[in-house]
Amino acid sequence: MNAGHNAALVPCPPPLTGGQKKFSGVETGAQISVDWLSLTFKTETSREREYVDSDGAVTWYDQLDDVKRAVWAGSGIDPTEWVDQPHGWNGYQQSAVGPCGSLLAWNAVGRDDYHVSLPGQACGMFSEISMRSFLRYSLNKNAKCTRLDINLDDHDRIVSPLQVEQAAQGPDIVTHVHRGMTQRGFAIGTEETTGVTVYIGQPSSRQRLRVYDKGLESNGEIDAVRWELQSRAEAAETLLPLLGVFDDGTMMSWGETFAGRLVSFVDFRNAEDHPTDARQRKRLAWFTALVQAAEKASAYPPREPRYINDVESWVEKSVGPSLRLLMEHWQDDNLTELRRIMAEAQLKPKHTAILARGRTPSNLPGFKY
């Protein structure tokens, strides 16, 4: 299962030279690409930077050079193309910029804590397989992914950004998001529209959808409507392995990954089919043309179940001082007010589940007597 039209789907842009934005030869169907990648690498111990040669001599390798070589292997950005800057970046002591807006930042001491940021044009220098390889390298290095955007370029223009806005304002949208925004550009002194961008989600959210006319933005070089799903924090962390290479060497289609993530974030289904249960509603035809029969793929890891002792610990640390304050104020040995508050409190389903679960089983990690 892939996003877009099966016969015309290009799963990833072909390799590009530095600075190019045009995906040559793609005029119909849908195309999937990685459009932003930010990673933070941190070595936990100095031993991981040790290299012992055949004579037993211990030397240290520079991890910053290591990641430069990894970027070079995937994108063609030569390690010598990074230009050191006279300032740091975002809390890091030192930084360097490379082609297409790529950025490296690190701390001078030990050079074992560093960040790499590859915006859209820099990601466009990777082929699919080289991007997958770089993501696998990042996983092997225990890198933390702070941002990872994946795009669908709809060259058939199945729906316009304004039509997406209209659908998002109507009853057919299925999402947990509460806010959206539309930006419009215009030429001064004329009624000419220079672009419409629709956002679903907040700038600070872990996921945000951006739909816009890439043809207008790129002066016709990429004649498509772009669906850009931005992922940060946990959403980026769980997306990274899906776009790389699994331990057994298998790979998941980028089209399948995009479609599953998109419909878990926002779906468009006919509200007239069922008044309350969105699962019984039929997906709208235009959205089906983009994602087919895609099923939800959760962007967040499942929450660990909470137990009675977790609640006890939380009450002791967070509520204990407030309870002490009230008890000092009430001066009530019979706990009348406290009993009243407890009697009026209503247990929610999550509370009854914790009550049924009881205390932490002794075979779970973190159990203490």
Residue ranges and their predicted role:
Residues 1-306, 314-369:
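Structured, helix-rich domain cores that form ligand/interaction pockets
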